């Protein structure tokens, strides 16, 4: 872990208090960058703030944009996680994945959180049991997991675009997360929502790195964002 890298929940305009809405992950990251980069805004300014990676997160109401599960940003709860599994960063910086029944016990400790659906990995083992066709068949997928060392793994699979990409079933995704060293992982929204945005090496421009199955970047509900506060230098570094 590094003190100058953190993971945050994100939402439309980087501000759910404006009401439910949908927007692209790239636009959510741009809004966060703008909000935290103005030195005159002393309440929100963060020195060297740099939104570098973002992925789509929770399932959502496709009419209103309301997330299905938890949404906590900067310690403020905008939507409860009492009805779905969730991924969270606690106030002490620890990453965790919990079930809906865990939410009440951890609520006061949560700094950032998004909801998810089924567990893929639990206690170091694949726990995919759903008989639903969506989980058994191959689709674009997004998920988040945590390793035994507490590192967070964000995973995106392109799909629905054969022969370019076939996607994966939930069971296949669970195996990928196990191979990545995860001891716990949950599925996030997938299909046309699956999005991976990043500033690529040597660039300060956000680009969609994957190939969304809709043919364009879909407007979604919540997202997860990786932020660096390391001073910008002319030297390349790599997240390993």
Name each model-derived stretch.
Residues 1-86, 96:
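Zymogen propeptides
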Residues 64-82, 89, 129-183, 193-237:
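Conserved, well-ordered active-site substructure
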Residues 10-18, 100-105, 157-162:
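Short, solvent-exposed aromatic-acidic interface loops
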